Amino acid sequence: MTSSANRTLRAGVIGLGMMGRNHVRVWDEAVPGVELAAVADPDADAVERATQGRRARGFDDPERMFAEEELDLVSIVAPTSLHLPVALNALRAGVNVLVEKPIAATREEATQMIEAARDAGRMLTVGHIERFNPAIRELRRRLADGELGRVFQVHATRLGPFPARIRDVGVVVDLAPHDLDIMRYLIGSEPVRIFAETERRIHTEHEDLFNGMLKFENGVIGVLDINWLTPTKKRTLSVTGERGMYVADYIAQDLVFYANPEANDTWTNDGVTSVAEGEMTRRRIDRQEPLTVELAEFAAAVRNGDEPPVDPHDAMVALLLARKMVESAERGEVIAGDALAEVIR
């Protein structure tokens, strides 16, 4: 494959469900310097719809796509059970890979993918799309600047209706990796203790209601409230610290700061009491579609030889933490010590 420095990159998409169609649209319309060259899905109707009005070729088999098309990048938006074989085929063909989260079904599969990318000299990154939300990026910048002072708690809320399309996993593995990843991304610390409760109310096989808690090494408490039972979507993240609280709305791309005007270095009782009386400030956010930002940064990293936008090891940790949450709920026990440390290594 020729150098990518000064030429149009050729992208492919594997998996043409709802999210796959979004990848098709963004690659085709929104990322400069990239052309959508090929798509693949076993559903012939889905392939026909995706290629209609576009120059991209359609395939019913990813292996044939890799054999017949010279690609630089591919989005793998297939079911989780297919991530490993499809990613291995792509990497062997010399194609840089973005795989939607979760990275894989197991640690072993994720490790195989990471090692295959290293051996092939190609990039593997993972679609943890919330990292590319402008509200979260602005929040991270402000936390790094110390605007909240000491951070006490991070509370993630991710609620919505039951998605009939999900069959292979429950709500924890499907959704919790988003927030587990963002917590580590924002506070720069690792969990040392976790506990979770789950219930199955509607889903026929897996849990659809989840509440979890994490204690991080730096003392921050993480709280997760996630379900498939709420008739409207809610996606928020609040971060509470000694100088107030930030609330980010993922959907609205909104970031609001509630100041604690009495906060000071000694953190007096008066300071605590005044939290409810703080002023509200809405931070200015330049709104962008997170998927467009994500794919543009993936393409730029490939073109420039940079590090992956999301380290696949971080994605593996998010997956394994989610699975440990399920284990905690099943056992009714706190998980800590070596049993949790093995997830991070």
PLM regions: where:
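Beta-loop-alpha module in the N-terminal Rossmann-like domain of NAD(P)-dependent dehydrogenases
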Residues: 23, 56-116
